[in-house]
Amino acid sequence: MKFKMKVVTQGILLCIFSQCLFGILYLFSIWLQPLSGTDVFAWRMLTMIFGLLLILFPTIGCRSLLSLITTTLGKSWTRWVLFLLGTLDAGSQFWLFMWAPLNGEGINIAMGYFLFPLIMAVLGWAWLKERLSFIQKIALLLAAAGVAHELWHTQSFSWTSLWVCTVYPFYYLSRKWMKIPALQGITLDIILISIPCFIYILSQSDTLSLVTQEYRYWLLLPALGIVSAISLSANLKSSQQIPVSIFAVLSYIEPILLFLIAVFVLDNQITTSDYFTYVPIWLSLIVIGIEGLLNKKKVR
């Protein structure tokens, strides 16, 4: 019991850490201008390979990646199809995350990430048969109230919001169901995604010349790869260590950070109505935090 609580606590800390890094990643599309969102996505995938390998080799080694391919996935066509569908899913989400801030879809993406945890929690209950505690139900109801207000206030639902909240949960839940190791899984994902990205970069002569001529890209692009590698591996690892319901509520940290970045960095104005969206979500996070403290005391 004590070991299980230790793993859950570690998963919660990893999830919070990864959500904070996702907030930083959102800024890279702005810092790397005049590169387009698609350019930033392609460079992110290529530089992330090196970041992931820097984590992989000193910790679990290259054999673990080979073991994923030969043993975990093996000769099962079903598992390979499910894995590759997840890879396509992840690739589309990575592209959308970098493309949205520069194409007027920032608010819609934030809405998608607000709905994402709710869909995760419902699917975790329906697909993985995870039970929700009373406190977790209260937290999810609070979060749902905030999201419902935002939907009522904006009265819009774009394709970008729909793509994030309905498609992205499949990636996390399928990997958890298949018991794919987090670091090895995301490394194989990025290797596969980087192949078309490499072809794309080679076809963009203007982008290549810009990156080679401006020294700031020599620092920003490696930083993009390292931050991406750490955030994604930590996030996927945490999703496998904690119940989906807790992971769902903690996932609200990212859209809240995106909101704060929009207000304090991008100078977007906050209205009184916005508080009716964000205060219930903040309260849901506090409720989950209280449950974690209570469970820790019970173990002691």
Curated annotation (Swiss-Prot):
**SUPFAM superfamilies (alphabetical):** Multidrug resistance efflux transporter EmrE
Question: Which is one Gene Ontology cellular component term of this protein?
Answer: plasma membrane
Question: Source organism's superkingdom?
Answer: Bacteria
Q: Which family does it belong to?
A: Belongs to the EamA transporter family.
Q: Where in the cell is it found?
A: Cell membrane
Q: Which InterPro entries match?
A: EamA_dom (IPR000620), RarD (IPR004626)
Q: Where are the transmembrane segments?
A: 13-35, 45-67, 80-102, 106-128, 180-202, 217-236, 243-265, 275-294
Q: Mention any Pfam family matching this sequence.
A: EamA
| Topology in membrane | Multi-pass membrane protein
Q: What's the protein here called?
A: Uncharacterized transporter HI_0223
User: What are the record keywords, sorted?
Assistant: Cell membrane, Membrane, Transmembrane, Transmembrane helix, Transport
